[in-house]
Amino acid sequence: MSIFKRQWFVLISAVSAALSVVLFPLEVFSASPNSGGGGVQQMNILQAIVLGFVQGMTEFLPISSTAHLKVVPVALGWGDPGVAFTAIIQLGSIAAVLWYFWGDLTRIIKGATRAIALKDYADYDLRLSLGIVLGTIPIVFFGLLIKTFIPDYDSSPIRSLGAIAVASIVMSLLLGVGEKLGKRERDFEHLTMQDGLLMGLAQALTLIPGVSRSGSTLTSGLFMGLQRETAARFSFLLGIPAITLAGLVELKDLLAEGIADGAALPLIMGVISAAIFSYLAIAGLLSFLKTQSTWVFIWYRLVFGVAILGAISAGILQNS
């Protein structure tokens, strides 16, 4: 396939996918869930599996899981599944990233521990682990600020579909600039603690729904001159503490409120579905970025955001 034909194929594929997500609800799934206790919406097993698929495929692709978990169920006529359900199935994504990177994590931890014992502060594994720690601080800091000073953040206008659409469009443009200007010279062995801190600052932007954690960190990595696969791989490692902490906090709050009768099995199936598809998304993206650019995601995010705004303007979706 020529470069020209491949570019058009990527563009058409991205446009078709984005439009289908926003504008073509599947009526076969259209039964709306009823409100359940503990902040979790009652849903059947099929709905939970589908939302687990959405969570898994979008958590690690640079297209925003928060945006899709809000848009897809609304477009399918199910209503908002609730913040609690979203947080619970995120545990599946946590399990997947730990599963995929278990070898890397154990090597880094053992290497860093050994370096500390030997006082070898120039050790690569120690520097990498410190970079991950430094990169986690910004999102924890700003997350605590939001939780403290904006207690109703989950229902604030910044989480509306319109705001999510704008964030998706802006991030698509930034990723496009990063793709164009990034030198892509540095590989995984040349990461620094500064990379961790800078990528961590970008990760903090994901507190704004629609930005995408993997999207913002991948974009920052390209601007810093990292190879695409290196930026994505470090993004996943950097996201482990942040995703884990967020999931555990929401899980604690949910358990304190209690889970409605009949909600446990769909939740479990949603977590399993999210774990399976998260693993596939991680493996697929890393393999894809070895030889391909991020333009398919750039076009997808752009059309996705524009389609949401168009659907809101046409009255197909409510800006809530």
Swiss-Prot record:
CC annotations in GO: plasma membrane
Any one GO molecular function term: undecaprenyl-diphosphatase activity
Subcellular location: Cell inner membrane
InterPro entries with a match to the protein in the record: UppP
Membrane topology: Multi-pass membrane protein
EC number(s) from the headed UniProt entry: 3.6.1.27
Residues passing through the membrane, by range: 9-29, 82-102, 130-150, 161-181, 191-211, 236-256, 265-285, 296-316
Gene Ontology process terms (BP): cell wall organization; peptidoglycan biosynthetic process; regulation of cell shape; response to antibiotic
One Pfam match: BacA
Swiss-Prot/TrEMBL catalytic activity: di-trans,octa-cis-undecaprenyl diphosphate + H2O = di-trans,octa-cis-undecaprenyl phosphate + phosphate + H(+)
This protein's UniProt keywords: Antibiotic resistance, Cell inner membrane, Cell membrane, Cell shape, Cell wall biogenesis/degradation, Hydrolase, Membrane, Peptidoglycan synthesis, Transmembrane, Transmembrane helix
Note: Bacitracin is thought to be involved in the inhibition of peptidoglycan synthesis by sequestering undecaprenyl diphosphate, thereby reducing the pool of lipid carrier available.
Stated family: Belongs to the UppP family.
Described function: Catalyzes the dephosphorylation of undecaprenyl diphosphate (UPP). Confers resistance to bacitracin.
Name of the protein described by the UniProt record: Undecaprenyl-diphosphatase
UniProt source species: Nostoc sp. (strain PCC 7120 / SAG 25.82 / UTEX 2576)
